[in-house]
Amino acid sequence: KLLHVGRGDFGELLAKLEEQYGIDETKANAEVKEYDVIVAGGGPAGVSAAIYSARKGLRVAIVAERIGGQVKETVGIENLISVPETTGNELADNLKTHLLRYPVDLLEHRKVEKVEVVGKQKQITTSVGEKFLAPALIIATGASWRKLNVPGEAEYIGRGVAFCPHCDGPFYKGKHVAVVGGGNSGIEAAIDLAGICSKVTVFEFMDELKADSVLQDRLKSLPNVEVFVSSQTTEVIGNGDKLTALRIKDRKTEEERLVELDGVFVQIGLSANSSVFRDIVETNRPGEIMIDAHCRTNVTGIYAAGDVSTVPYKQIIISMGEGAKAALSAFDDRVRGII
């Protein structure tokens, strides 16, 4: 499918076309290009790792679907120390501007499709067939929205089921939407959507909201928001064209009801984007890549940083620090002759 929901640009469209129809044969068969460090992922951790590596005078490539990563789906950012207030898009633009001040090969609108360990070298194959080689690989592919995995959800993604309030919220102006999830991301989404939509209904699986009290207080002050706890979403219902309702079960009474609405924003957390690496490096049960205090994985020369790793607290500022740490660890291992 070439359907794109939300924001995009020509580079993303080109990448989709290359994936679906292939690329020029000479490009696919080109000689493997070698680097000192390859960074997979273009979020705060990936960009930080690339900049720190480049500042050491190393040959660096960064392979990313988009610079900014999950940050681009954040409306307001007020906890990035020394930057009192910014937006996800502004931060993503600033990350790219800073990155391009250094001689880094930016390979945007691509994904890492395959990783092979050949001696001390790591060979990377991208989604468009390019191959790259380096002794150090820093995985900073972040995390993705978790899905409900209920009947009807997959069918109506992009047709009423959404995950990014910032991207898709304006499409529901003046309409009734639901937010599934009562953590910080869910309540932030509800607050944001309340300024656009006629009504916002929040459904939380647990018996109480999990969001910070300051967010809950803000939510309670909004007249067009309704909250239901102990509520399980069991089905997404539509008319074949778009979503029309959710089936909700009260976990205390076991009673089910249909809630008619125009859209639902699923905000139940993130899942580590580690699937392509799981046969190479060790992961925990949720799929996060296991790392030590220096961002090293169980494979010499492979490091992980940010939301894809086991580092606690998935925050922008922490991801930036972890990316820097991974780069410094890789450089230290290089100097010591480990990689």
Question: In which residue ranges do the predicted regions lie?
Answer:
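Beta1-alpha1 glycine-rich phosphate/pyrophosphate-binding loop at the start
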Residues: 35-104, 187-213, 220, 228, ...
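N-terminal FAD cofactor-binding segment of flavoenzymes
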Residues: 48, 52-60, 141, 154-157, ...
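Rossmann-like nucleotide/phosphate-binding core characteristic of flavoprotein oxidoreductases
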Residues: 1-37, 55-59, 249-251, 255-263, ...
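Glycine-rich dinucleotide-binding loop and its adjacent helix/turn
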Residues: 10, 14-35, 143-196, 290-292
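A Rossmann-like FAD-binding core segment of flavoenzymes
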Residues: 92-134, 139, 194-293, 332-339
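Conserved N-terminal Rossmann-fold NAD(P)-binding element of oxidoreductases
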Residues: 40-41, 139, 178-181
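Phosphate-coordination loops involved in phosphoryl transfer and adenosine-cofactor binding
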Residues: 32-36, 109, 173-175, 230, ...
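FAD-site-proximal beta/loop scaffold in flavoenzymes
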Residues: 144, 149, 155-171, 260, ...
